[in-house]
Amino acid sequence: LLVAKLINEHNPKRHIDIASRVDGFVAHVASYREIEVVDVRPLKKSVHENIKFRQADLMNSQDLGKTDSLSCLHAIEHFGLGRYTDPIDVDGHNKGITNLVNLIEENGRMYISFPIGKNDEVHFNAHRVFHPATILKHPSIEKSMRLIRFDFVDDNGDLHLSKSIKDVDTNTKFGCGIYTFEKTLTS
């Protein structure tokens, strides 16, 4: 609900979502605006007029046009692990982040969330967990994105709004980082 609220407040011209749950986040956004959904998995034709779907693998560059708003919530940690019909690729999450950043126009926003913990880890047949600061070191993020907001859920399930990455407990095992980036350069 937090990211749906942030998108509503920002009111972008176009919003694309990458692989988030249709029965959760996507439905929340579709209740008040059009949302384009892109996923590697097929989706049955939506009966909701605000949901537009395209099947695509974001580990590969896609010609979706530029957008001023993009979300990828609890999905990037699965890229390249083969769990959702995608090919096995140890670098799948990095390719995915690069391709997400390339879809965003200058001054556009990217909302991305994933599991956070004290170390970068791969959990077999499940997902990755990232140190909260790892994404800041990704070349595409370093080159053209600026973190404008960070929220997180801790191991107890408590939501912490508008915090610093340094506020995450160093012993966190399985929290959720929610990052809002703004694109500063066209790449």
Residue ranges and their predicted role:
Residues 1-11:
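A short, well-structured juxtamembrane/interface segment
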Residues 21-32:
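Conserved SAM-binding loop of SAM-dependent methyltransferases across substrates and taxa
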Residues 34-40:
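Conserved SAM-binding motif I beta-strand of class I
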Residues 71, 78-186:
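S-adenosyl-L-methionine-dependent methyltransferase catalytic module, highlighting the catalytic core
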Residues 10-21:
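Conserved class I S-adenosyl-L-methionine
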Residues 49-60:
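Conserved SAM-binding strand-loop segment of SAM-dependent methyltransferases
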Residues 12, 32-33, 107-108:
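A short helix->loop->beta-strand "cap" motif at the edges of active sites that frequently abuts
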Residues 60-71:
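A short acidic, Gly/Pro-enriched loop at the edge of an enzyme's catalytic core
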